[in-house]
Amino acid sequence: SLLQFETLIMKVAKKSGMVWYSNYGCYCGWGGQGRPQDATDRCCFVHDCCYGKVTGCDPKMDVYSFSEENGDIVCGGDDPCKKEICECDRAAAICFRDNLNTYNDKKYWAFGAKNCPQEESEPC
């Protein structure tokens, strides 16, 4: 679920997903089109693609299980679809953490769809 995604971002990247990633670049936030603008935006692009491959459950609403082991997030549970959602969220949170040094809110916060032409969109 989106609430769990927020939790994973807080645990892994030590940032609020709602504050830092809800309206950034062309792909961080609702929807997405155009070309990812930087490494952080590419994290969101890859996350969107990952959600797009999930079938049989709702990535934004369905609750999955995870645990922390030695500082790492481990996705669990018996439902393969929900586990896949967790893996998408986990990978994005790690990507955000690993690319904090390229995050540029002055340039890409509230970037807007007008700066992300549909015809420049990349396939997943």
Curated annotation (Swiss-Prot):
Cofactors that this protein relies on: Ca(2+)
What chemistry does it catalyse, as a reaction equation? a 1,2-diacyl-sn-glycero-3-phosphocholine + H2O = a 1-acyl-sn-glycero-3-phosphocholine + a fatty acid + H(+)
Any binding details for the cofactor?
Answer: Binds 1 Ca(2+) ion.
Q: What is its EC number?
A: 3.1.1.4
Question: What are the entry keywords?
Answer: Calcium, Disulfide bond, Hydrolase, Lipid degradation, Lipid metabolism, Metal-binding, Secreted
The alphabetized list of GO BP terms reads: arachidonate secretion; lipid catabolic process; phospholipid metabolic process
What is the tissue specificity? Expressed by the venom gland.
Q: Where does Ca(2+) bind?
A: 27, 29, 31, 48
Q: Which cysteines does the record link by disulfide bonds?
A: 26-116, 28-44, 43-95, 49-124, 50-88, 57-81, 75-86
Mind listing the GO molecular function terms for this protein?
A: calcium ion binding; calcium-dependent phospholipase A2 activity; phospholipid binding
What is the active site of this protein?
47, 89
Residues in a coiled coil are none
Q: Where in the cell is it found?
A: Secreted
Q: Name one GO cellular component term.
A: extracellular region
Q: One Pfam family, please name it.
A: Phospholip_A2_1
Question: What Gene3D superfamilies does the entry give?
Answer: Phospholipase A2 domain
Read off the SUPFAM superfamilies from this record: Phospholipase A2, PLA2 (SSF48619)
Q: Which SMART domains match?
A: PA2c
The lineage's top-level taxon is Eukaryota
Query: InterPro entries, per this entry?
Result: PLipase_A2 (IPR001211), PLipase_A2_Asp_AS (IPR033112), PLipase_A2_dom (IPR016090), PLipase_A2_dom_sf (IPR036444), PLipase_A2_His_AS (IPR033113)
Q: Tell me the protein family, please.
A: Belongs to the phospholipase A2 family. Group II subfamily. D49 sub-subfamily.
Please explain the role this protein plays, according to its UniProt record. Answer: PLA2 catalyzes the calcium-dependent hydrolysis of the 2-acyl groups in 3-sn-phosphoglycerides.
> Which named protein is this?
Acidic phospholipase A2 A
